[in-house]
UniProtKB/Swiss-Prot annotation:
This is Secreted effector protein PipB2. It is found in: Secreted; Host membrane. Pfam families: Pentapeptide, PipB2_N. The gene is pipB2. Interacts with the host kinesin light chain (KLC), a subunit of the kinesin-1 motor complex. It comes from the Bacteria. The keyword Membrane applies. NCBIfam families: PRK15196.1. GO terms for cellular component: extracellular region; host cell membrane; membrane. It comes from Salmonella paratyphi A (strain ATCC 9150 / SARB42). Its main location: secreted. Keywords: Host membrane, Membrane, Repeat, Secreted, Virulence. InterPro entries: 5peptide_repeat, PipB2_N.
Length: 350
């Protein structure tokens, strides 16, 4: 009896106190020598049973929250009760009149027996909000609720056309997710992982992607006006036809990105690296590319009028049929071929 209550209390503490992949593995692994032996001879039967119970706990919690709260932004109830979890009653008591501990108290009971644990309030609330987020956007619940950094686990999520205006997606894992046509205006995506995600046609204006991973992302036709992409990883990303007016990409890794047809008027790309990038028919008037690494980048039919290339690395950079009037190239490093091109056709601007 006590071992069953203790196991369920441990699962509740792991699921709603951490919610990470490591916490799930720890909570569902065999605990005793006997369980390890049975698990071995049943080809993981103990772990599978525990994982099923863990998943049921999460899904029951999500449904309970959804039915008791008017919307996911509302305050969490002071008492959340899950009845009949494997014959047990699970109660979460949040800090308030009946709980002055400052932590969430978890009580698992069956008959006269009970087990109690404590969960940090901040972690508990973050996990509950993540469950409600999945409910709102009809995403199946996952046993891994949060990333190791504490962001939502939304790996591979389908969020096409979703309204995520001003959403907090810091440190979230959205790798491989489909956000085509979604609205993330003013969303906070600092440190988030969008590797391989589809962001085509998304509205990302005024959003924060500082230090985010957008590697291999498909962002064709996205709007990134005034967005913060400082330190972001955009390697091999497709930014065809993007609007990036006054976008801050300083220090970003944009190696081998495709910026063809993009509008980068007054964009700040200082200190960014664009090695091997393809930039065809883009508008980059007054763009700031100071100290940028443009080695082997290819600029074709691009308007760079008034762009600042001071101290930039232009070794083996290709400029073909570009508008290079009013350029600043002080202390820029360039190959002989590039220097010859500038001297021949644009000497008055050097």
């Amino acid at each position: 009896m006590q071992r069953s209550l203790d196991s369920l209390a441990g699962m509740a503490t792991s699921a709603f106190g951490a919610g990470t992949s490591a916490a799930m593995r720890q909570a569902t692994s065999p605990k005793t020598i006997l369980e390890y032996i049975i698990n071995f001879f049943t080809c993981g039967g103990i772990r599978r049973r525990n994982e099923t119970q863990y998943q049921e706990l999460i899904e029951t919690m999500a449904e309970t929250l959804k039915s008791t709260m008017p919307d996911r932004g509302a305050p969490l109830p002071e008492n959340i009760i899950l009845d009949d979890m494997d014959g047990c009653r699970v109660e979460f008591n949040l800090p308030g009149e009946n709980n002055e501990a400052g932590q969430v108290i978890v009580r698992v009971s069956k008959g006269d027996h009970s087990e109690t644990r404590e969960i940090p309030l901040v972690s508990f609330e973050k996990i509950c909000r993540a469950l409600l987020f999945r409910c709102e956007f009809s995403l199946p619940q996952d046993s891994v609720i949060l990333t190791a950094q504490g962001g939502m686990n939304l790996k591979g999520a389908v969020l096409t056309g979703a309204n995520l205006t001003a959403e907090n997606l810091c440190d979230a894992d959205l790798s491989g997710a489909n956000l085509e046509g979604a609205v993330l205006f003013m969303a906070d995506c600092e440190g988030a992982n969008f590797k391989g995600a589809n962001l085509s046609g998304t509205s990302l204006g005024d959003s924060n992607f500082k230090n985010a991973c957008l590697e291999d992302g498909i962002m064709c036709g996205a709007t990134l006006d005034h967005a913060n992409l400082t330190g972001a990883n955009l390697q091999h990303a497709s930014l065809l036809g993007c609007s990036m007016i006054e976008c801050n990409c300083s220090g970003a890794n944009m190696d081998h990105t495709n910026l063809s047809g993009a509008t980068l008027i007054r964009a700040d790309m200082s200190g960014a690296t664009l090695q091997g990038a393809t930039i065809m028919a883009a508008i980059m008037e007054d763009a700031v590319l100071t100290r940028a690494n443009l080695r082997k980048a290819s600029f074709i039919s691009t308007n760079l009028d008034g762009a600042d290339l001071a101290e930039a690395n232009l070794n083996n950079t290709c400029f073909k049929d570009c508008t290079l009037t009013h350029l600043r190239t002080e202390d820029a490093t360039m190959s002989t071929s590039t220097q010859t091109l500038f001297n021949e056709f644009y000497s008055e601007n050097i």
